[in-house]
Swiss-Prot record:
It comes from the Bacteria. It is found in: Cytoplasm. This is ATP-dependent dethiobiotin synthetase BioD. HAMAP family: BioD (MF_00336). The lineage of its organism: Bacteria, Pseudomonadati, Pseudomonadota, Betaproteobacteria, Burkholderiales. The active site is at residue 40. Homodimer. It catalyses: (7R,8S)-7,8-diammoniononanoate + CO2 + ATP = (4R,5S)-dethiobiotin + ADP + phosphate + 3 H(+). Its cofactor is Mg(2+).
Length: 240
C-alpha cells in the first residue's frame, strides 16, 4: 500500500473560499477512488449543538470527506469566538501548540489515503507570540495549494503569498482561482496573468478556475478541478 498523501490549503486572505475549495478537492479525491479525510486544525468560531461545540467550516469538510476523523483529530483546537486565533486563544486560555497538530496529522494519515489540511485565514496568521500558520505548514512538511480569491488586488496578494510559501521551502503544488466577486471586471485577464506568473516563478499549475456559485456546491465545483494533476504533484513531492 502506498504512503498517504497530504496537502496544506492556504489562501490569499480570509473569506476567499478555502473551505469551499478544500471540500471540492475532497469530492474529487473520493471520485478518484481514494479515502479522503480533512483536518481544520485551528478553527475560530463555534456554535453549540446537542451539547457539543462545532464549527461551520469543519462541518462542511466532514460533509465532503468520505472518511470521518474523530473531532479531536480533525480539529485539535476549536475556539469559540470568530476572530484572530492567537487573540481568541489567549482570551480563552488555550495554547495553540503546533506539536499537538502534527501528532493529530500523523494519526489522520493512518486512517486515509489523502488528507486535506485547511489552514486558517491567510498563509501567515499568528498562532502565538512568535509562531504562525506558515510555521505550522513547515512543521507538517506539506505541499501547499493556494486558493486565490479573484477580486481586485488578487494578483499582488497571490504573488506575495507564493513568495512567502517559497521562502519557507515549501512546494507550491498548484493554485485555484475562486471567483468571489461576480462583478469584477477583467476577471479572466487577472487569472491569465496569475497563471503565467505563478507558472514561471514557481512552476505552480492552475488546478482550476471556479465560477461564482450561489449557493456554493463543492461537489459541482470539484468537476472543474484537475485532481489528477494535483495528485501527481503530491506524489512527486512525497518523501522518498
Amino acid at each position: 500500500m502506498s504512503a498517504p498523501l497530504s496537502l496544506f490549503v492556504t489562501g490569499t486572505d480570509t473569506e476567499i473560499g478555502k473551505t469551499f475549495v478544500s471540500a471540492a478537492l475532497l469530492h474529487g479525491f473520493a471520485r478518484a477512488g481514494l479515502r479522503a479525510a480533512a483536518m481544520k486544525p485551528v478553527a475560530a468560531g463555534a456554535y453549540e449543538r446537542d451539547g457539543a461545540w462545532r464549527n461551520e467550516d469543519a462541518d462542511q469538510l466532514d460533509a465532503a470527506a468520505n472518511v470521518a476523523l474523530p473531532a479531536a483529530i480533525r480539529t485539535p483546537f476549536l475556539l469559540k469566538a470568530p476572530a484572530a486565533p492567537h487573540i481568541v486563544a489567549a482570551r480563552e486560555g488555550v495554547a495553540l501548540d503546533i506539536g499537538t497538530i502534527v501528532d493529530a496529522h500523523r494519526r489522520a494519515c493512518e486512517m486515509a489515503d489523502v488528507i486535506v489540511v485547511e489552514g486558517v485565514g491567510g498563509f501567515r496568521v499568528p498562532l502565538a507570540d512568535t509562531r504562525d500558520t506558515a510555521d505550522l505548514a513547515v512543521a507538517l512538511g506539506l505541499p501547499v495549494v493556494l486558493v486565490v480569491g479573484v477580486r481586485l488586488g488578487c494578483i499582488s496578494h497571490a504573488l506575495l503569498t507564493a513568495e512567502a510559501i517559497a521562502a519557507r521551502g515549501l512546494p507550491l503544488a498548484g493554485w485555484v482561482a475562486n471567483r468571489i466577486d461576480p462583478a469584477m471586471p477583467f476577471a479572466d485577464d487577472n487569472v491569465d496573468t496569475l497563471r503565467a506568473w505563478l507558472e514561471r516563478e514557481h512552476r505552480a499549475p492552475l488546478l482550476g478556475a471556479l465560477a461564482h456559485m450561489s449557493p456554493p456546491s463543492p461537489d459541482a465545483a470539484s468537476h472543474a478541478l484537475d485532481v489528477n494533476l494535483l495528485l501527481n504533484a503530491l506524489r512527486a513531492a512525497a518523501p522518498r
